[in-house]
Amino acid sequence: WPEVSEVEDVEPDMAQAYVEELIRRERSGGRIGRVMASLRKLDRACRITGVFGKDAPPLLPYITDGGLSGFHSEPRPVAYFPEQAERIIEWIINIDPISARVLHVMQKTGLRIREAVYLRAQDIDVATCIITLEGDVNHTKGGRPREVRISPEEIPFLSEIKAIGEKNPTGHIFHDRGSLPDRVREQVRKACKALRIPCLGTHGFRKTFAAQNYKNRIEAGADDDQALLDTSIQLGHNRKDVTIQSYVPPQDRRN
């Protein structure tokens, strides 16, 4: 609302629409919770100072008054089961094969959604099964570069997507990169609803990769700490605690 420059002009539907947009973009529960708390603090302060009348409707009603449910920052290391991920992709592929391909990239490489849509042919080394991300060029979080090692079983897939990128002047595998993430998110929501699968958003596919990477490392002889740290590095983190908190549930770990 660029036309709104004064706090007294902020309406409840604006506040609710802003929070709903954060939800649609799959922002973290912690961030959404902080935004909601800030809006309610603003509401209280404006009533105390007389900017809002005492009888004015709340900027952001609580759930008991018909508002949005609360959000918290506690991470959940819950992924789609491999068969769930495949069902979602199969549902989407018939109506939006491009979105389905993005999800396949996330599932098989662990890339974040923006990293996936900005992936280029020149980032993929099929012979070594390594994807090299160059920070801002690949839209990595914080602009940090990293390498992701992919299972040799995925060589046919890597060859396929690399060939797609090689047909484009920039090497990018996907077009419409600015709008594509939101499109993919919407398709995932529709698929999960239709298939009655608990929706974990697009990030659930990254978690599916993380769970499989941890399992592969354990099967290759790594201990729990080594497998956790390797998975964190693959995902673009540098602490095993991140994997423990957000990616690999306790029941799937070897302690």
Where are these regions (language model features)?
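Alpha-helix N-cap/helix-start motif at helix boundaries, enriched for small hydrophobics
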Residues: 102-103, 114-119, 231
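Catalytic-site neighborhood detector that most strongly recognizes the C-terminal catalytic loop/helix
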Residues: 234-255
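C-terminal catalytic core of tyrosine-transesterase DNA break-rejoin enzymes
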Residues: 104, 208-239
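DNA breakage-rejoining catalytic core of tyrosine-based enzymes
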Residues: 67-87, 140-152, 169
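Active-site/catalytic core of tyrosine-dependent DNA strand-transfer enzymes
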Residues: 151-214
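Basic, Lys/Arg- and aromatic-enriched nucleic-acid-binding interface segment
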Residues: 82-113
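N-terminal core-binding DNA-recognition domain of tyrosine recombinases/integrases
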Residues: 1-73
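Conserved tyrosine-mediated DNA breakage-rejoining catalytic core shared by Y-recombinases
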Residues: 118-157
